[in-house]
């Protein structure tokens, strides 16, 4: 959708604009995967990729840990890259994808706001994120690779140079979908269409 120049909501976030030309073009492209190219609607990405029944999957980079744990027999036979993009009229490639995030909150009625703030500053700091990621991976191996949102910490975790560059490049081409009341239903309706 974003690669087609579209968006999900109007600027005020009061209504969907999924009936716009870019949205309809993106939806057609999306449904073509299933109707024209016969992509399975019930694809078990891990199993089908592991067995070679599908040769490419579009998954979050956290899928890396799943493959490390569940498919050691194909270790070294796969890699990941930035999502392919749409060639624009000027020849540039738009590889924008939508992204989601989670956040940390401190409730306004908390009796320990300052302590909570100090904890969040510590927890999201590079050193804590690297220490946590390293500790988890030392226990679980590569299947425990921690998906930190701290980009400085991400650079310090044991990604290969090619893997790290792919992740960082995709980060530069990720656009958060705005939050709107009831917005959690939007993706459900799109997927079930």
Residue spans for each PLM region:
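A structural signal for well-ordered alpha-helical scaffolds and beta->alpha junctions
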Residues: 20-27, 60, 160, 183, ...
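Paired acidic/hydrophobic, glycine-rich loop segments that form the ligand-binding mouth/hinge
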Residues: 55-60, 79-81
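Short helices/loops that flank or line small-molecule/ion binding pockets
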Residues: 44-57, 192
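Extracytoplasmic/periplasmic solute-binding protein
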Residues: 1-15, 54-56
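C-terminal lobe and pocket-closing loops
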Residues: 64-74, 84-192
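A generic secondary-structure signal for well-formed alpha-helical elements
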Residues: 1-8, 34-37, 61, 71, ...
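Glycine-centered hinge/linker elements that transmit conformational signals in sensory
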Residues: 11-42, 83
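Amphipathic, well-packed alpha-helical segments that form the structural scaffold of globular domains
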Residues: 2-5, 28-31, 191
């Amino acid at each position: 959708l974003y690669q087609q120049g579209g968006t999900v909501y109007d600027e005020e976030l009061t209504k969907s604009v999924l009936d716009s030309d870019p949205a309809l073009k993106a939806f057609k492209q999306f449904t073509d995967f299933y109707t024209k190219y016969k992509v399975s609607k019930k694809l078990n990405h891990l199993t089908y990729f592991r067995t070679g029944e599908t040769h490419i999957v579009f998954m979050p980079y956290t899928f890396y840990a799943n493959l490390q744990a569940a498919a050691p027999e194909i270790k070294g036979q796969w890699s990941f890259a930035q999502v392919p993009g749409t060639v624009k009229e000027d020849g540039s490639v738009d590889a924008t994808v939508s992204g989601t995030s989670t956040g940390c909150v401190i409730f306004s009625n908390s009796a320990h706001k300052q302590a909570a703030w100090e904890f969040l500053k510590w927890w999201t700091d590079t050193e804590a994120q690297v220490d946590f990621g390293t500790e988890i991976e030392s226990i679980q191996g590569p299947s425990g690779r921690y998906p930190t949102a701290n980009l400085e910490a991400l650079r310090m975790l044991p990604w290969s140079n090619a893997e790290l560059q792919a992740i960082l490049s995709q980060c530069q081409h990720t656009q958060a979908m705005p939050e709107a009341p009831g917005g959690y239903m939007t993706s459900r309706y799109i997927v079930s269409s």
